């Protein structure tokens, strides 16, 4: 019996793209109207260039919750943070925008992929979310096998 591939068995960049595509096609995810104006953190000068950045960030948060759960907004702010350029002084680490991450988590809660942890220690992936992510990973694995074979 062959084990179904999980999110951990596939390339992280590709699975995030596949999940983002799934979220966009499904129509369940509503992009906030402020998404074209916002910066993703204090470390950025401009808003994201990619018009689908909200789907990608939401997919990345879902993958992160699959890998390490429970996780809160503060931990995700550290994950998505970066170096703040301060001119001639040395760079300094700064966290990402908490509002963007919070809205992504609320979006995942609305489609029933994520729920709040009973102890209040962040959020966890639901059984439905885990099942959908595993299904996307197995479809991705099948598509790459088909294209790689001669």
Swiss-Prot record:
Keyword Ribosomal protein among record annotations: yes
Disulfide bond annotation, renumbered to this chain: none
Family annotation (Gene3D superfamilies): Winged helix-like DNA-binding domain superfamily/Winged helix DNA-binding domain
GO BP, sorted A to Z: ribosomal small subunit assembly; translation
Any GO MF annotation of the entry: RNA binding
Domain of life: Eukaryota
InterPro entries xrefs: Ribosomal_eS19, Ribosomal_eS19_CS, WH-like_DNA-bd_sf, WH_DNA-bd_sf
UniProt KW keywords: Ribonucleoprotein, Ribosomal protein
Gene Ontology annotations for the cellular component aspect, listed alphabetically: cytosolic small ribosomal subunit
PROSITE patterns per record: RIBOSOMAL_S19E
Keyword Ribonucleoprotein among record annotations: yes
Similarity annotation: Belongs to the eukaryotic ribosomal protein eS19 family.
Name under which the protein is recorded: Small ribosomal subunit protein eS19S
Name of the gene this protein is made from: RPS19S
